Amino acid sequence: MSLNIGVIGTGAIGQDHIRRCSKVLQGSRIVAVTDINRESATKVIRDLGIEANVYADGYEVINAKEVEAVLVTSWGPSHEEFVLAAVAAGKYVFCEKPLAVTAEGCKRIVEAEAAQGKRLVQVGFMRPYDQGYRALKDVITSGKIGEPLMLHCAHRNPRVGDNYTTSMAITDTLIHEIDVLRWLLDDDYVSVQVVFPRKAKHAKTHLRDPQVVLFETAKGTRIDVEIFVNCQYGYDIQCEVVGDSGIAKLPEPSSVLLRSEARLSNEILTDWKDRFIDAYDVELQAFINDVLAEKLTGPSAWDGFAAAVTADACIAAQESGQIVPIRLPQRPDFYDK
């Protein structure tokens, strides 16, 4: 049995997902595509040798009879309208981040989904599908290190483009930690503070880099996340969990241990795509399997909403220098079904 998928947006990530669904993953078939540049959509399916209909816009893809599930990989500000349309049509939808560009937009999606009476939306947070993070969560859940007391984390990029801003350290970079750490701890944030150390010499004039983000959770766990997007040396993700009776650390990506020229060394990756490439495959395969089973289990619209509310608080903390409360409403029981 195959799931017939329609794709809205054939840019870089859209092309990657089309390739995955048609060449790598099991149980899926791309049957419809659209892009603001129709020629781009046509070229993608031609180059991949796919027989799919090219539609004028996302609404036509959503309402096409042959489409059973939708992938939204278009421009970020268009995500909300297409997700809402898919939910209204009663179709499962996988939406790359952001779910919406505002917390209010995410809330509208949560409300629309709840009105349908079943989960229809999955958000494209891929780190919960990374083998290393899953192993780390297994250790935490097992109780081997006791209750988590502190987390020390880092998200480092070698460099960023000239258009990267201080707030993008939250919305484009930290957003992944915001989601995955909630998932790791099964806990919500209650406050955040952002501290700016001495500025890195490679940071552009308009960018404050690095940053240290300090969270407190509802259960009292303290989290510090270093965001350093001009570290120069590579793409480096770190996460160390300090518990009552032990410490668990996110494993490093597998690489050859090299002994050469009087040195012992491991390679450090430089591209985020290489670091999480397998997680993207696992994530989308899980979505396909869940839709065929008619029960989504991945990151939900509520997770997207929680991430947006938290990101807004982080930006407020950047601007004020104060500890900012993070106020999430009660999660609907709908998401516990």
Swiss-Prot record:
It comes from the Bacteria. It catalyses: myo-inositol + NAD(+) = scyllo-inosose + NADH + H(+). Its EC number is 1.1.1.18. InterPro entries: Gfo-Idh-MocA_inositol_DH, Gfo/Idh/MocA-like_OxRdtase_C, Gfo/Idh/MocA-like_OxRdtase_N, MI/DCI_dehydrogenase, NAD(P)-bd_dom_sf. GO terms for molecular function: inositol 2-dehydrogenase (NAD+) activity; nucleotide binding. Keywords: NAD, Oxidoreductase. Pfam families: GFO_IDH_MocA (PF01408), GFO_IDH_MocA_C (PF02894). GO terms for biological process: inositol catabolic process. PANTHER family: INOSITOL 2-DEHYDROGENASE, PTHR43593. Belongs to the Gfo/Idh/MocA family. Homotetramer. Involved in the oxidation of myo-inositol (MI) to 2-keto-myo-inositol (2KMI or 2-inosose). This is Inositol 2-dehydrogenase. It comes from Yersinia enterocolitica serotype O:8 / biotype 1B (strain NCTC 13174 / 8081). The lineage of its organism: Bacteria, Pseudomonadati, Pseudomonadota, Gammaproteobacteria, Enterobacterales.
